[in-house]
């Protein structure tokens, strides 16, 4: 029996989940937010209890110390020695990493080198890795990459139609993201359908604050909507998704507040999407409240959101030459019945039909009618469990 922590570290946050392995039992979970500020928030959930404290956490090293000390303080572990492994979610692995790896100095350097591919994610993840290696130097640390699952895409799919020297010299290509989630929910969908994954054609829709759609052919990713960075694809919570790239120099020339390409990319990443269009919120619950109030900006943002998701799903029906099931997952995918209904209603030509009695908040499983030719499933993703499993698997290779 061992205890493994799954970590998802951002630039100012550290989300974690502690497992007892191999039983895969969640012992505790939590998040430390506002790292670097004097009013950081540490939240711990365990045994049906919730503890929350506001304190000064200046950096990721102090965040990790706080996490471990909380585990001892609340009696979840006795000593640091009970932690035998830690797994880190890394958004961008580039072409360096086709699978999860045990961390060493070179791995940390490569994660930092790939920051341009995931500027909102990789720097924070690298800081989290360094913090754990400093405080728990003797345990097995593992990196699990969002991009690994998508390394099965063929060259004609992952290359952009620009001169090939930009791929050869600078590795500009589609990498995708959310791969851990897409892989997990495809496996769970196969179990729900009672069929081998290697016989299925699935379209998996990870719809959270970040949104990505993946075409899964017999268990492998053959195309996905996120690209060189997680900015590409459908409209998202704060991200624009795909836009005409000529907009970038145009905006720099027109708007004095946007001084260079970095300013525009920051706007596209953090001030766009549902939040940017609506002017209300990036949270679908707030957008739906705006729909109820007939707020025209909320209606517009919602309609763009649905339209972009439908278009990517339609593309992947063409890529796969049909599909056995459409799978919704992640925050909105699992908890926004109205969004699911409006997406599927716009794809009825493909033979999909939702059962309104099943398409309700909290339901998991098959939400399609008996007559639906393409099944529509809601599957809870569990990226943290996938990370913990990879830690256990790789520990065996070095023991």
From Swiss-Prot:
The record marks 178, 239 as: Transition state stabilizer. Keywords: ATP-binding, Cytoplasm, Kinase, Magnesium, Metal-binding, Nucleotide-binding, Transferase. Transmembrane segments: none annotated. The keyword Kinase applies. Its main location: cytoplasm. NCBIfam families: ackA (TIGR00016). Homodimer. This is Acetate kinase. The gene is ackA.
